[in-house]
Amino acid sequence: MNFVQNTPIFNKINISNIQFRSNPAVYTGTFEPSKDSFITYPNTDINALAQSARTNPKIAEILAEYKIPFKFNSKELEKLQQGHLKDTRLVAAKMYSALPDDLKSEVNLKDLQEAAMFHDYGKALIPEKILNKEGKLDKREKEIMELHSELGYELLKGVGVNQNVLQMIKYHHQTPDGNGYPIAGDDFSPSIGAQILSAADKYSALREERSYKPAMRKEEALKILQEDVKSGLIAPEIYTALEKVV
């Protein structure tokens, strides 16, 4: 079932009756993805990923179109693994634990956690001067930054990651109203897992210090996401699960 604003599922849940489920099934330990127990792909180490990037013709095509020189930034990837990806995975797994049962049944928790740990891997191919720019990105830089979803999809497709995880990675910046990226067509709607990942990703990013902004307090981050609900960018049930666990 797809989870979009114009479907009955938005109206079938009494949000006030959603009960918080404590102790989500989250693995804690070393955060190198190839070593996490819930990740079943042996070829997600840095060397295998770099080789996948070099030999993928679609990645070469995307980089050539935007005149981006090939560079696999392993240091940036390692930084993401230890910080933002770990944080996003923990938030996403906790959000899953707070969903009502009928929505939980639409999500594979292991796949969700893998997608959260992999979702920004495409940034290893984004030029560092854009990725860590202190000021606002211009139009061209923004277009290049937005390539990371599709680049991550292609990168991880090359090491055998399953399609459910890949779809969440590719479309974690898609929105229920169809205004996200990459362009997916009028009849596309992001899965519940992708929407959980999107909200967890944005919340984690807002709470972190970045080169272009200071870290936000929890209340500030939630207020921004509340506005996203009003704008149709986040489904109310997804936001409620986030609010309950943070």
Where are these regions (language model features)?
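Non-Sec secretion/translocation targeting segments of pathogen effectors
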Residues: 1-39
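Extended charged
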Residues: 1-2, 201, 236
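Acidic/His-rich, divalent-metal-binding segments that scaffold phosphate/diphosphate chemistry
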Residues: 28-146, 157-159
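An active-site-proximal "capping" alpha-helix that borders the catalytic cofactor pocket
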Residues: 87-95, 144-157, 216-234
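His-Asp-centered metal-binding catalytic motifs of divalent-metal-dependent phosphohydrolases/nucleases
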Residues: 107-135, 152, 167-181, 197, ...
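Histidine/acidic-rich helix-loop-helix segments that form or flank divalent-metal centers
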Residues: 112-116, 156-158, 163-197, 213-214, ...
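Short, charged, surface-exposed loops that flank catalytic or proteolytic processing sites
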Residues: 136-137, 210-218
